[in-house]
Amino acid sequence: MAELKLISAESVTEGHPDKVCDQISDAILDDMLAQDPHSHVAVETCATVGQFFVFGEVTSEGYSDIQNIVRSVVRNIGYTSSRVGLDADSCGVTVSLTEQSPEINQGVARLSGEEESKASREQRYEAQGAGDQGVMFGYACDETDVLMPLPIHLAHRLAYRLAEVRKSGEVPHLRPDGKTQVTIEYDDDDHPVRLDTVLVSTQHDPEVDQAWLKEQLTEHVIRPVLDDVLADRVAHDEYRVLVNPTGSFILGGPAADAGLTGRKIIVDTYGGAAHHGGGAFSGKDPSKVDRSAAYAARWVAKNIVAAGLAHKVEVQVAYAIGVADPVSINVETYGTEIGVTREQIQQAVRKVFDLRPAAIIDELDLKRPIYSKTAAYGHFGREDADFTWEATNKVDELKEAIKA
């Protein structure tokens, strides 16, 4: 008997300590972009027992009340009492922000404000180099309606629902920290065929009975999400459910584990289905190609799959600091291209998509304060108008470029 091919992916809730830090960093970024869309921001957050440290580099015409932003984010997540391990109103907040290095800035902003206002679009695109070197990846596949890998999409939906039932009180006695994990069986053609395991770990009040909790989460979180996402496309009549496998989960959040911005990069992207260049997203303005180019690569990949040119695709793009044009662009279709060659798809991508940093920022409208909502439950596969990199607005152009 052939060995089963089982693929897993995890997600975490907004109360996970690393995600708390991501949300703080992106809330600070949004506040600065709201005041000055040209802000250059690279903000990291670290969390430990009752204490947050915010540090990094910022160049902006705006002023942000960092202390208030931190407390607001923590409060909205649900850490409002020492009873749950963290009190937004009494936790310590230490801030250490400096200006962006002028050597980095000179490669990103070669035009002064007056020069930029007079420059043509092409001049602006050529003048703005990448904020750093690096390799970024984007991915899409036809396993789900949102063209994401099924394991990570399902894990995100479960994590989001877990937070929903906590906040609404539909399932009482839950606390903010939590994680989900999904295992899917694939056939020899790499198609998902069966749900194997659902794992949910959630922080809770001390008096909670674990058997009761498993029943509640199965009824109010797991089954509704599975019925909505899987429907009839993947077998899910029999699967294993694990809830808090170690037993109790009372102490959570930063009181149990230190948190740090950028430490959930696989959760943020494709759950391990694609490569990752290593650069995190949260706290970085769009001049940082770690973020903007990864968003653009997803945009490219999603349009390729939406155009029916391949069943799955990974787009790699690389940059040199201070240089506008990508050093390289590569499209990998894993032999799943449909009626075209991989080379034809790659040539079409080069014709249709301008992947210079300033062009990406313009095309995807990335200088807006939209990033807080990206900081939990995934940056990709979200059906939200502000997630412009999820638009399939280049499908027709790709098809025409293939014909040319």
From Swiss-Prot:
Residue sites binding Mg(2+) per the record: D18
Cofactor note: Binds 2 divalent ions per subunit.
Cofactor(s) the protein needs: Mg(2+); K(+)
Location of the region described as Flexible loop in the Swiss-Prot/TrEMBL record: 100-110
Database matches in PROSITE patterns: ADOMET_SYNTHASE_1, ADOMET_SYNTHASE_2
InterPro entries: ADOMET_SYNTHASE_CS (IPR022631), S-AdoMet_synt_C (IPR022630), S-AdoMet_synt_central (IPR022629), S-AdoMet_synt_N (IPR022628), S-AdoMet_synthetase (IPR002133), S-AdoMet_synthetase_sfam (IPR022636)
Recorded metabolic or biological pathway in which this protein acts: Amino-acid biosynthesis; S-adenosyl-L-methionine biosynthesis; S-adenosyl-L-methionine from L-methionine: step 1/1
Binding site for L-methionine: E57, Q100, D257, K288
Localization terms from the record: Cytoplasm
Keywords: ATP-binding, Cytoplasm, Magnesium, Metal-binding, Nucleotide-binding, One-carbon metabolism, Potassium, Transferase
Binding site for K(+): E44
Cross-referenced NCBIfam families: metK
Free-text function comment from the UniProt entry: Catalyzes the formation of S-adenosylmethionine (AdoMet) from methionine and ATP. The overall synthetic reaction is composed of two sequential steps, AdoMet formation and the subsequent tripolyphosphate hydrolysis which occurs prior to release of AdoMet from the enzyme.
Entry's family note: Belongs to the AdoMet synthase family.
Designated name of the protein: S-adenosylmethionine synthase
